[in-house]
Amino acid sequence: MKKLLENLSLWMGIIILVTLLFGQVALNFGFGIRNEKIQFSEFLDLVEKGEVQKIVIEGYDISGVLKSGTRFYTKATQYTELIPLLRKNNVDFQVASGDSFLGLLFNILISWFPMLLLIGVWIFFMKQMQAGGNKTMTFGKSKARLLSDRSNKVTFHDVAGIDEAKEELAEIVEFLREPKKFQKLGGKIPKGCLLIGPPGTGKTLLAKAIAGEAKVPFFSISGSDFVEMFVGVGASRVRDMFEQGKKNAPCLIFIDEIDAVGRHRGVGFGGGNDEREQTLNQLLVEMDGFEANEGVIIIAATNRPDVLDPALLRPGRFDRQITISIPDIAGRQKILEVHLKKIPTAPNVEVSIIARGTPGFSGADLANLVNESALIAARRNKKVVTNEDFEYARDKILMGMERKSLVMREEEKLLTAYHEAGHAVTSLKLEASDPIHKATIIPRGRALGLVMRLPEHDRVSFTRAKMHADLIVAMGGRAAEQVIFGDDKTTSGAASDIKQATHLARSMVTKWGMSEKVGPLLYGEQNDPNNHILSIEMSNLIDSEVKQLITDALKEATKILNENIESLHRIAKALLEYETLTGQELSDLLEGKPFLKKTADDKKVVSKSSLDVEDDTVDKETLEKLESDLDTGDKE
């Protein structure tokens, strides 16, 4: 503040001085007024003619005004008869003193003004260079942002669904509140705590809640903030960060995405002389050099613990590793209750139903779901958020936005309907498959149609039967195309299904030991640089086993569809008519039961006979039209 006042005073003085000088010059020389310069002889002629009204004589300078209003000035010479001439012609004249103090001071300032201006410019540039030098020296300063205990409003009440992690960190909160309680008994609080978990599970929020509960300063920094283009900057920032922590102890330092700086040493293009490794070395030294009474605790977060350096994870640095996983149904319900407090909801909205229908959602996904539901309700001009808004938001997140502007031809709709019906029939006939939530032929995202399945319960592992069922369901679309239209009419719509099936089958063979010929061995990914090189024979064997799994799944899907061909036709016809069907409606169609379908106008009962087919083929007219359109397209 003092420096700011000094700068303001300096510039105000300069502005006032320049203003005074300009005003004095304007006063004496008539700046801004047009003055006409004339010769002294011409001036004498004008006096004799009586055209001069008044003049001012200052030394050898004469300025005045003619009777016509024109201003003039001239330089006088040694002319002793000037005063009598002026009196004779009744010219009003005034003699000014040229050697007064103000005039002398003004002349001095005028003569020194260019030099003073140069000195001022030089001082200005020197200050700018000095400020630039200070900015350059701040490269080594820490970029950690301080969140004081007053501004941090997040507490454990704002964190839900990760009760085990909160229990683990409660000890740290107690230490930050009462460090002497532990030190009296000789106990040492963990110097570092590493939060491990997928993105969106609340690692950063949990760290802020710890600082909010303990009422201590909270420093936040990203792992990428340490490394710059200059050598040694990262290590300097680490030192400065820990110095700030010691000054504000007890405090909490949170390093987000620590894998950016804590990656395993000796791996990468930099080798052992990498700037990142110097930063990591300094971080290791600073963490190991803490004393128990300093009250500075490091909490870091990462979703890639496998790439961290082992020295960073040893006891004495990050003593505790807390895994934060995707919340289960109970955790999702608690998270939704926290977010639903912020929006008005309809009385019939049940949090348990929403939580049951969002398996695999992280805390960030659930927050996004609630926000999307509120936006959808506002777009529909509602006063509260209803179940329909939550369901629409969930479908939008899981399946993508509806592409209503995409116009599909009838033959393309027919192909898509049978493709999705193939997925639906195979899924419904396999007990190990997840229940179907919804099937649609409305284009969503990059898909022309899809069958979305949702598990009834949270899973921590998968059985071989479940994986085989997923392979069969994935190949159900291609199998339906072959059964109904033949091999020549199969489409590229199964590209995503084939990719998904290939990835699953390869994982079964190379990761989970579900191939008798390959055996229970881990081979890893083909593009993994840490993976050992496979022999040609083993690589061919793996490819052969993967192909066999997918081929068997395609054969099994074809068998299921041939045995349930009437159900396949009914479901395809219903998809063409209604475009979207729920899981219960698909089950009713598979069993030939009537079901209620709510349309835009009313509730229409679709009977079994209205969707039945006379034989095991599609309507002849429809097929003939489709084949004609496809043949025309091939010719074009």
Curated annotation (Swiss-Prot):
<protein>
    <recommendedName>
        <fullName>ATP-dependent zinc metalloprotease FtsH</fullName>
        <ecNumber>3.4.24.-</ecNumber>
    </recommendedName>
</protein>
<dbReference type="GO" id="GO:0006508">
    <property type="term" value="P:proteolysis"/>
</dbReference>
<feature type="binding site">
    <location>
        <begin position="197"/>
        <end position="204"/>
    </location>
    <ligand>
        <name>ATP</name>
    </ligand>
</feature>
<feature type="topological domain" description="Cytoplasmic">
    <location>
        <begin position="1"/>
        <end position="12"/>
    </location>
</feature>
<feature type="transmembrane region" description="Helical">
    <location>
        <begin position="13"/>
        <end position="33"/>
    </location>
</feature>
<keyword id="KW-0378">Hydrolase</keyword>
<keyword id="KW-0479">Metal-binding</keyword>
<dbReference type="GO" id="GO:0016887">
    <property type="term" value="F:ATP hydrolysis activity"/>
</dbReference>
<feature type="transmembrane region" description="Helical">
    <location>
        <begin position="105"/>
        <end position="125"/>
    </location>
</feature>
<dbReference type="Pfam" id="PF01434">
    <property type="entry name" value="Peptidase_M41"/>
</dbReference>
<keyword id="KW-1133">Transmembrane helix</keyword>
<feature type="binding site">
    <location>
        <position position="497"/>
    </location>
    <ligand>
        <name>Zn(2+)</name>
    </ligand>
</feature>
<keyword id="KW-0862">Zinc</keyword>
<comment type="subunit">
    <text>Homohexamer.</text>
</comment>
<dbReference type="GO" id="GO:0005886">
    <property type="term" value="C:plasma membrane"/>
</dbReference>
<dbReference type="GO" id="GO:0005524">
    <property type="term" value="F:ATP binding"/>
</dbReference>
<dbReference type="GO" id="GO:0004176">
    <property type="term" value="F:ATP-dependent peptidase activity"/>
</dbReference>
<keyword id="KW-0067">ATP-binding</keyword>
<dbReference type="InterPro" id="IPR041569">
    <property type="entry name" value="AAA_lid_3"/>
</dbReference>
<comment type="function">
    <text>Acts as a processive, ATP-dependent zinc metallopeptidase for both cytoplasmic and membrane proteins. Plays a role in the quality control of integral membrane proteins.</text>
</comment>
<keyword id="KW-0547">Nucleotide-binding</keyword>
<feature type="topological domain" description="Cytoplasmic">
    <location>
        <begin position="126"/>
        <end position="636"/>
    </location>
</feature>
<feature type="binding site">
    <location>
        <position position="419"/>
    </location>
    <ligand>
        <name>Zn(2+)</name>
    </ligand>
</feature>
<keyword id="KW-1003">Cell membrane</keyword>
<feature type="binding site">
    <location>
        <position position="423"/>
    </location>
    <ligand>
        <name>Zn(2+)</name>
    </ligand>
</feature>
<dbReference type="InterPro" id="IPR011546">
    <property type="entry name" value="Pept_M41_FtsH_extracell"/>
</dbReference>
<keyword id="KW-0997">Cell inner membrane</keyword>
<dbReference type="Pfam" id="PF17862">
    <property type="entry name" value="AAA_lid_3"/>
</dbReference>
<dbReference type="InterPro" id="IPR003593">
    <property type="entry name" value="AAA+_ATPase"/>
</dbReference>
<feature type="topological domain" description="Periplasmic">
    <location>
        <begin position="34"/>
        <end position="104"/>
    </location>
</feature>
<dbReference type="InterPro" id="IPR037219">
    <property type="entry name" value="Peptidase_M41-like"/>
</dbReference>
<dbReference type="Pfam" id="PF06480">
    <property type="entry name" value="FtsH_ext"/>
</dbReference>
<dbReference type="InterPro" id="IPR003960">
    <property type="entry name" value="ATPase_AAA_CS"/>
</dbReference>
<keyword id="KW-0482">Metalloprotease</keyword>
<dbReference type="GO" id="GO:0004222">
    <property type="term" value="F:metalloendopeptidase activity"/>
</dbReference>
<dbReference type="GO" id="GO:0008270">
    <property type="term" value="F:zinc ion binding"/>
</dbReference>
<comment type="similarity">
    <text>In the central section; belongs to the AAA ATPase family.</text>
</comment>
<keyword id="KW-0645">Protease</keyword>
<dbReference type="InterPro" id="IPR005936">
    <property type="entry name" value="FtsH"/>
</dbReference>
<dbReference type="GO" id="GO:0030163">
    <property type="term" value="P:protein catabolic process"/>
</dbReference>
<keyword id="KW-0472">Membrane</keyword>
<dbReference type="InterPro" id="IPR003959">
    <property type="entry name" value="ATPase_AAA_core"/>
</dbReference>
